[in-house]
């Protein structure tokens, strides 16, 4: 089926393709789409950069489509420094985790709002953790932050480990990688000012994402580490 005319889109990734074309991965409300951009060294090629909201028309019925029309739509989210690395991280998560051509309009909207917030200079960590959690939720990988795997309420004085396939499990013995109940309850309320909440959220999201990302390291994470 032909793709809708004039759908909003962002560039997630691009690379040279044949002599004068580019192979571009787009993120649209209808999902992650891959398409060939002909004459990529011309006017259209100047728009192939991340964080620019585009109006896009794709042609073709197969998985590899062709860019029929592409125009800038609105103001780009200009990201610099750590905000730029954060934006690249979001793009890499979407490239690695989103199935091709599966609609995720809620993720698209959250992504747009997150880019705007990054451009405004808002604190990075809450934005990244919120996006990671929304992505897990929309993909069906989320788990309860207020109840454990036995449907018992998370206890503020309890210790928990994450079982990625089931959720949070209370444990009695200290071991690496545990989470305090009081931190989990803060995360359930998105209370980023609570002591230890941001660090716990970072550890929790890293554990939750790892099994879905696989063993291949994230390039954006390495860039952030070496900045």
Swiss-Prot record:
The keyword Heme does not apply. GO terms for cellular component: bacterial nucleoid. Keywords: DNA damage, DNA recombination, DNA repair. It holds the Pfam family RecO_N. One of its GO terms (biological process) is DNA recombination. Gene3D superfamilies: Nucleic acid-binding proteins (2.40.50.140), Recombination protein O, C-terminal domain (1.20.1440.120). InterPro entries: ARFGAP/RecO, DNA_rep/recomb_RecO_N, NA-bd_OB-fold, RecO, RecO_C. Involved in DNA repair and RecF pathway recombination. Belongs to the RecO family. This is DNA repair protein RecO. The lineage of its organism: Bacteria, Pseudomonadati, Pseudomonadota, Gammaproteobacteria, Pseudomonadales.
């Amino acid at each position: 089926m032909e793709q809708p005319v004039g759908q909003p889109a962002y560039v997630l990734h691009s690379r040279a393709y044949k002599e004068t074309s580019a192979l571009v991965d787009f993120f649209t409300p209808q999902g992650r789409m891959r398409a060939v951009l002909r004459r990529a060294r011309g006017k259209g090629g100047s728009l192939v950069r991340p964080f620019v909201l585009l109006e896009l028309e794709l042609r073709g019925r197969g998985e590899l489509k062709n860019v029929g029309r592409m125009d800038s739509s609105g103001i780009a989210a200009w990201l610099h420094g750590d905000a730029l690395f954060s934006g690249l991280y979001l793009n890499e998560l979407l490239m690695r985790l989103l199935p091709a051509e599966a609609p995720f309009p809620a993720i698209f909207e959250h992504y747009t709002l997150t880019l705007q917030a990054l451009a405004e200079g808002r604190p990075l960590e809450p934005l990244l953790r919120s996006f990671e959690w929304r992505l897990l939720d929309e993909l069906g990988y989320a788990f309860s932050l207020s109840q454990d795997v036995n449907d018992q309420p998370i206890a503020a004085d309890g210790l928990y480990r994450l079982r990625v396939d089931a959720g949070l499990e209370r444990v009695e013995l200290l071991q690496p990688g545990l989470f305090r109940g009081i931190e989990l309850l803060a995360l359930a309320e998105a209370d980023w000012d609570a002591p230890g909440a941001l660090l716990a959220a970072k550890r929790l999201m890293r554990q939750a994402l790892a099994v879905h990302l696989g063993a291949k390291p994230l390039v954006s994470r390495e860039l952030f580490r070496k900045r």
